[in-house]
A protein has these predicted regions:
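Glycine-rich phosphate-binding P-loop
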Residues: 57-82
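N-terminal pre-Walker A segment at the start of P-loop NTPase domains
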Residues: 17-54
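Conserved nucleotide-sensing/catalytic segment adjacent to the nucleotide-binding pocket
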Residues: 83-150
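Hydrophobic, Leu/Ile/Phe/Ala-enriched alpha-helical segments that form helix-helix packing faces
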Residues: 43-51, 76-81, 129-134, 152
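Generic detector of short, locally flexible boundary/turn motifs and exposed helical patches
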Residues: 22-28, 38, 73-79, 104-109, ...
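Long, mid-chain structured domain cores
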Residues: 1-25
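Hydrophobic/aromatic beta-strand patches that form the interior of the parallel beta-sheet core
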Residues: 59, 85, 111, 159-164
Length: 177
């Protein structure tokens, strides 16, 4: 065996050792990572590693309904020892927040926004809260980022990571408008 180069392992390398395989990364877009439903454990670990990093991070998660997007975000937050807050969600019932209380403004929180719910919401206070949260130096996770960017000034280029979660490899992620 001949070594040609040594490098410090990245968190993707550590996850590959832990789970026995590398995370699939888009060849054309290096910030896009693909997972299947059977890989939820790997996805949760991946999110937890991202959530452990300090500072602003904007993560988008694409996927059809009932594939495990929200549950993975919450589980990743728990693994990273971070508190999670729904700004908008459909996990238990439809949640649309229009304000946060004093203790909920924290760089150590993970803010979860359902882009489909927020895109349909007409309450200006909710839209103002979303804008406020987007400026915080913390982690924001947007489900359905493609729908989210249709109704505000953000673009896909603003996202640091895009995660695609599918039932199976060939499932298409499509949205009805």
């Amino acid at each position: 065996i001949e070594r040609t180069k040594l490098r410090m392992p990245e968190f993707r390398d550590r996850l590959a050792v832990r789970h026995g395989r590398y995370i699939e990364q888009d060849a054309g877009d290096k910030k896009t990572f693909r997972f299947e439903r059977e890989d939820l454990g790997l996805l949760v670990d991946f999110l937890a590693e991202l959530f452990k990093e300090d500072g602003h991070k904007l993560i988008g998660i694409r996927g059809m309904p009932r594939v495990g997007k929200t549950e993975s975000i919450v589980a990743g937050s728990v693994c990273a020892h971070k508190r999670w807050l729904f700004i908008s969600s459909t996990l238990i019932k439809q949640t649309v927040r229009s304000s946060l209380i004093k203790g909920e403004y924290d760089a150590n929180h993970v803010y979860i926004i359902d882009g489909a719910v927020t895109a349909r919401e007409t309450n200006p206070k909710h839209q103002q809260l979303v804008e406020e949260v987007m400026t915080l130096p913390s982690i924001k996770v947007v489900e359905h980022p493609d729908l989210f960017i249709e109704t505000n000034q953000y673009s896909i280029d603003d996202f640091d990571y895009i995660i695609e979660l599918r039932e199976h490899e060939n499932q298409k992620i499509e949205y009805d408008h």
